[in-house]
């Protein structure tokens, strides 16, 4: 069975069976995807995280299908209906749709019309009709008039019910209808009468009709959401006449009275049973595909957001702006610890501007502030301009930071545990400041669904969404690596091999014993075994470690290789890291062994060139157009700076400094065909856009991307 799985996965993913086998062995041994991708390239043949995850997913699907087959076989055996041919078909089938079609005639059912007819003894009459030789079926039906069967027509009706069920369970019949759906199905949506005003936001779908295969994921998810809210009636249908004709060609073999009875049963089978069954199947399939597309978009956006450029370890002032309630100001040290908080009121209706300036100046000097993070919510533009009009004694950079999800964090258990003595306003301002310092470390504390970069994220399969988002966060955290001495337990949770309990144990050990000076000390952490150490060590950094390799992505299992390189050059490891001239003298082929190949050696040398490098780029300052404050300030043709805030499969939403974001439709991203917006833009990218149209009633702004 395992070898069969390897063959099927290999055919699906175009990856060799050997690579698949080795990868599955590593996963079974408890290795994580980031660890395998980074430190086991020789074993897997250099597979990346996406390929490893695909292997894992395919293997899990096949396992689930194998369990389903076992259940089906047991059920049919219990009925005493298993035959060698049927067993062979089940054994050879690895398509879930075909498998369920095979099982359908044996599947336990509720009391159907066909079952009622069988109980009335009408199955022989149904068999007679299907032979289509009897010239006078009405007369033969009279023999069945007894008990609950009132007359010959009642008997024929029961027989037709049996035939209809047989037709609906026939594999070829189902495939005929399925083929028609796949080729020509049209999805139709209509507004529910009397719900027009309530459904106004779905007005694009009030009279909607489109081939299902051309319906985009965002259209499908919007339609299904409106249907769930009781605002739209939705159906999926092929050409009904063509389907019935094809079915009749299969089942109606005689142009006589029996043939007419069978034709009537076929029509009933299609309308009452087959069409609705296959429609449900295609509704589920199209929803699943739309979910996968929406999740893919969400994952891409989340990855870009998590890997946004950090300001780094600087002393930051965070401001959660507001008008009437004032601006909450916090001051943090370079490690993100809260030093001070207070309110200022520089805006209407309070207008304590002079006092606000004085307070800001004093806090900057008292806490040696190097940068200011302003939340991008209410009063953001006014607060940013207020700060930029001030003259500080030293140069202070002002950044506008997304507040999305900050309120969720400030009311969460994580925030309460971090700041039990402070209210939500302080916690929110701290989160804004920390997002500037290190977006990844702060955003992992927030449910990704609250960050605001998804597309219908509440409508998609929540289990699949959570799995994909968790994998994305894990991938990003391990790609960047974390400082073992400053990382929160929540950030450490995502490190390969750790999880919540070990992460908390590390934080507790750090609190009791002081900062880690060596990766080896991890083995003293309660419940840290050899396997967990192997999985996590390479992703944890210690900036002031005794061994400089402890602040790199070089795994401890490879330290001996670097030490040998240094020894061969007559220098220390620290000198080797410091000198490019020395590193250029290294011939990696000298260090090849049965367990260490060229991929690992290349990674080691790359890491020695830039030890502990951060894959995230440098942070950039951005300014909105000062003349645009509300949607009413916009006009067609206006060119504006903006920041890409969200990407969907139909375009990109751009923050232009007002309450409403503008949409750059897919067709307006470039002067050529674009199938994926991610080819052109990324989250947080600074862009220039042209206003195409403004709908103030619906609060919609259409933009065009201006190529640089």
What is the predicted function of each stretch?
Residues 1-21, 28:
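Generic start-of-chain signal for non-secretory N-termini
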Residues 179-186, 319-323, 377-382, 401-408, ...:
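A glycine-rich phosphate-binding loop feature that marks nucleotide/adenosyl-phosphate handling sites
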Residues 542-708:
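Single-stranded RNA-binding regions, centering on S1/OB-family and related RNA-binding modules
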Residues 39-41, 130, 239, 321, ...:
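Short, ordered loop/turn segments at secondary-structure junctions
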Residues 5, 57, 64-81, 91, ...:
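Long, highly charged, low-complexity intrinsically disordered interaction regions
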Residues 51-54, 61, 65-75, 79-318, ...:
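Duplex nucleic acid-engaging cores and interfaces of nucleic-acid transaction enzymes
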Residues 75, 89, 99-102, 226-239, ...:
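Structured, non-catalytic alpha/beta "coupling" segments that mediate domain-domain communication
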